[in-house]
């Protein structure tokens, strides 16, 4: 199967999902740009779209080339409650950068909002909704293709976000940063999905906080909740690019390695191919990644689901499927690795003989 030749036809998100198409999301911006020296850890705010636009543009381009069908605006934590006077310029620049890169292909642009810093201490629905509306106003002026409310740990605030995003008539996706135990108030994943569907979300799922397998467990519970309530919604998953089976209800932020010691936990490209296949088999059709997801992880999703999509991403021109490019190596034991069975059964070592396999969460 050859890489796609030239730009594909740009179709709206719900048209794609309604027809059963796979939609490949993009990956993580905060962690990747922090490692590259353009985002400050702790604050995790996206001033880079104004300060270092070429760095953000480059990452968008890498995700697009890797096979992403959607480019999210780099607007995580870009609400007025976190950025004060900078918020409007940052949101506008983020939209422009994503749109500029998307215009080079068939990618859609999604305007993204996330949970506020206010909810935990001041559950003021009116004030929080107004914060969402400020970002929404920029997205509407910039004519993004659809909207995503992501990284919500309380379903009540996620519902408020959906209600606001629906005000402009664009399709709305919503993802919560929860695991199988549910939100931080104990609302189950199934009930979260039901409330979000009834609030009007078109696409429902999870993002961040948890690794591939935990995220898929949560998606299964969401799917069951929707089914039992007689509701229908498209499903979406954008997990971490890290293995986190030992984290608690709060996810990877409670692990002692967060955020600067997570590299030994990075998922391999083959892990992500398995994740993509299992997500697809579960009925999820919008599949991407969040923190820790690099462009090669997105390529892994696109390659695994190439039979369903009908094409490979441009970045596959430089990648042998399941290591097939290794058959040209001069060393026979490396040539022997040019096969799927080898990489699917490999148990990779960390090279750290005195380190534990798992950690104990701090919270």
UniProtKB/Swiss-Prot annotation:
The keyword Zinc applies. It comes from the Eukaryota. It catalyses: S-methyl-L-methionine + L-homocysteine = 2 L-methionine + H(+). One of its GO terms (molecular function) is S-methylmethionine-homocysteine S-methyltransferase activity. One of its GO terms (biological process) is S-methylmethionine metabolic process. It is an enzyme of class 2 (transferase). Keywords: Metal-binding, Methyltransferase, Transferase, Zinc. Pathway: Amino-acid biosynthesis; L-methionine biosynthesis via de novo pathway; L-methionine from L-homocysteine (BhmT route): step 1/1. One of its GO terms (cellular component) is cytosol. Zn(2+) binds at residues 208, 290-291. Its EC number is 2.1.1.10. Binds 1 zinc ion per subunit. Gene3D superfamilies: Homocysteine-binding-like domain. Residues 11-305 form the Hcy-binding domain. Its cofactor is Zn(2+). Involved in the regulation of homocysteine metabolism. Converts betaine and homocysteine to dimethylglycine and methionine, respectively. This reaction is also required for the irreversible oxidation of choline. Homotetramer. This is S-methylmethionine--homocysteine S-methyltransferase BHMT2. It comes from Rattus norvegicus (Rat). The gene is Bhmt2.
């Amino acid at each position: 199967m050859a890489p796609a030749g030239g730009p594909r036809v740009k179709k709206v998100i719900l048209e794609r999902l309604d027809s059963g198409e796979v939609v490949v999301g993009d990956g993580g911006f905060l962690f990747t740009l922090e490692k590259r020296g353009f985002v400050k850890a702790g604050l995790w705010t996206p001033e880079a779209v104004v300060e270092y636009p070429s760095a953000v543009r480059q990452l968008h381009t890498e995700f697009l080339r890797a096979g992403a069908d959607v480019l999210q605006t780099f607007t995580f934590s870009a609400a007025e409650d976190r950025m004060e006077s900078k918020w409007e310029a940052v949101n506008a620049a983020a939209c422009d950068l994503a749109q500029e890169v998307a215009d080079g292909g068939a990618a859609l642009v999604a305007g993204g909002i996330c949970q506020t810093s206010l909810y935990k201490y001041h559950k003021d629905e009116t004030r929080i909704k107004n914060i969402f509306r400020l970002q929404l106003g920029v997205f509407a002026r910039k004519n993004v293709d659809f909207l995503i409310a992501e990284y919500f740990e309380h379903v009540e605030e996620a519902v408020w976000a959906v209600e606001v995003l629906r005000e402009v008539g664009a399709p709305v996706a919503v993802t919560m940063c929860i695991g199988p135990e549910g939100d931080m108030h104990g609302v189950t994943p199934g009930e979260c999905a039901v409330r979000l569907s009834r609030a009007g979300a078109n696409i429902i799922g999870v993002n961040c906080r948890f690794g591939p397998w935990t995220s898929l467990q949560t998606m299964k519970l969401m799917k069951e909740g929707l089914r039992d309530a007689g509701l229908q919604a498209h499903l979406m998953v954008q997990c971490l690019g890290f293995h986190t089976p030992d984290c608690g209800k709060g996810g990877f932020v409670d692990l002692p390695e967060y955020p600067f010691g997570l590299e030994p936990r990075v998922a391999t490209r083959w892990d992500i191919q398995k994740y993509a296949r299992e997500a697809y088999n579960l009925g999820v059709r919008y599949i991407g990644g969040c923190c820790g997801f690099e462009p090669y992880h997105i390529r892994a999703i696109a390659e695994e689901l190439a039979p369903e999509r009908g094409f490979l991403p441009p970045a596959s021109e430089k990648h042998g499927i399941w290591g097939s490019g290794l058959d040209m190596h001069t060393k026979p034991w490396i040539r022997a690795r040019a096969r799927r069975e080898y990489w699917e059964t490999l148990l990779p070592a960390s090279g750290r003989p005195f380190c534990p396999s798992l950690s104990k969460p701090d919270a």
